[in-house]
């Protein structure tokens, strides 16, 4: 086995900190900064120090091994990209303010790549001419850029982040399904090797487009995603992808709709209190503008509208809430008293499936200080489109079996898409088919957040003392600590050299003038799997071995320590 380098902490460009950073909100942010893995450069921009770079490198290695195992080929494309391909697919506009746009000295428009679907499509268009050239899977590991409005949580949500993005190209849909399955299995192997607890959940495609999408989520309190798990069946989904069943009910016995005076009740809370009813008996109607046109969104009064779902439904159109000015010159829209009946053709009405045909509601009467009761969906008003647009709650019924769902927070660490022909259509990617005619290529897109995986590991694998890395991703295999005296330092360096000669990666704390207590604290903070201490019994050739994860410690001879750590 080749010699591994010994990293001396006396030479290491990584200072540990006793206190949490003032702006740190989540555990991974605190520990990665305190342990000397990363440093903040600016809002959403991070510098990776030597220890952090080693962890990143280990994750990259695992990703490469598993991608290569499914026949994927690694390439490197530019991060600075021309506008034209993104204009052709519509994403120059769709990405909105999250896209970093810039111009060269001649006024040409460019962007910093958030993902590379367009550029990979053009690459394959240039290289592949026949069905014989396909299928092919290409990937890269590269920094991506998104102009986050509020970068937060350390490396979890930054403006620059390291990502593995891969793309599959097939002639037939069956081939796309196979490429998708290959990636799905590879991702499972990757995250299992990393030691991450994860869930595979149904997801929405968003601006990426496509017919099928799944996310790989790492459960963690610091996560920005919320997913639902069914305790009774195998259903799991990002809350944005959950769809409530549309179940019509019989409204034969519901009396005719009737206006009722309700002065000073412009909110659901005041209305329910005034009438002595539950908020769930009322119908809330939220007005939004979609590319400037007013749309009404109907949900039960006890539920909140999930604007992410509304935006996803209308994507790529821009969605915004109405303002007071939008009511001017619109006598049919009475602020605080809007109802779906009588809105007219000028206003599109979408409703949550809970507002099913036959359900009866108390809702606005489109008159000041007036509501209407016994307003029945499908009888007194029509719904243009049913879309699940409510914020999912704990206990909502599972779409598969009806059992109450359980909600958890998680970090998105991977996302896979069956894109279909969206990008091939926009950029005219065809190859010569087996029948001698042009065949439009179908495509998949697959991402892993490499730098985000570091944060997810730090969230899941830590204790009150610091980080606890697995051997696969740790910056070293063994952290050797010289307690301080010359004899102890000499033994520590000797053991380190022998371990390195056997191929063991060693981080040795040989710092002079640093107390043993500080060294021990730093060793636990940094989180290398095995800690070897050359301490008070160094003169006897005895050292202490400590397992960072379990906390178990044992005094053994140097020879025994070397045997254990090199076996």
UniProtKB/Swiss-Prot annotation:
PROSITE patterns: AA_TRNA_LIGASE_II. InterPro entries: aa-tRNA-synt_IIb (IPR002314), aa-tRNA-synth_II (IPR006195), aa-tRNA-synth_II/BPL/LPL (IPR045864), Anticodon-bd (IPR004154), Anticodon-bd_dom_sf (IPR036621), Pro-tRNA-ligase_IIa (IPR002316), Pro-tRNA-synth_IIa_bac-type (IPR004500), Pro-tRNA-Synthase_IIa_type1 (IPR023717). GO terms for molecular function: aminoacyl-tRNA deacylase activity; ATP binding; proline-tRNA ligase activity. One of its GO terms (biological process) is prolyl-tRNA aminoacylation. It comes from the Bacteria. CDD domains: ProRS_anticodon_short, ProRS_core_prok. Consists of three domains: the N-terminal catalytic domain, the editing domain and the C-terminal anticodon-binding domain. Homodimer. This is Proline--tRNA ligase.
